[in-house]
């Protein structure tokens, strides 16, 4: 499979981040087993893309994880498991993996790899993912994610059930609910553990 791997340089973060999005993944049980067994070749953040609202949502979790990594504040094994944990609005690591991480039934997968060593390059990550992920690569953008996101599951995970109660106030009939939801989940990521 070819990859639509994107390499990003986030503001204030010295490490490049490699991100790929896949649909119709056929080998999720294999990928999950590689993580569980601790296979160093599969040190990635494998995220169930149905739990990702937008590009900003994903990159907020990635930013938090890398920032915690750079400041020696990891609560999990490495920056990649910390990325999955960073999606969570609470401090329960196991719960974050259940809700946001890859499962045997995952069909849409967001893959994140942080270049924590010089040998992790765009080319090496692209080649490994092309060999390892049996799925259709798609662009990592808001349009694609909007077709994948399970809004009901996301609202439940972030306890935002009452968020949609505002009346429509725009000419096109929208009320900015999507933007409010995005800001709420990003706020939950930023504030986790602040109390």
Curated annotation (Swiss-Prot):
GO terms for biological process: tRNA threonylcarbamoyladenosine modification. It comes from the Eukaryota. It is found in: Nucleus; Chromosome, Telomere. One of its GO terms (cellular component) is cytosol. InterPro entries: CGI121/TPRKB, CGI121/TPRKB_sf. Keywords: Activator, Chromosome, Nucleus, Telomere, Transcription, Transcription regulation, tRNA processing. Belongs to the CGI121/TPRKB family. Component of the EKC/KEOPS complex composed of at least bud32, cgi121, gon7, kae1 and pcc1; the whole complex dimerizes. This is EKC/KEOPS complex subunit cgi121. It comes from Aspergillus terreus (strain NIH 2624 / FGSC A1156). The gene is cgi121.
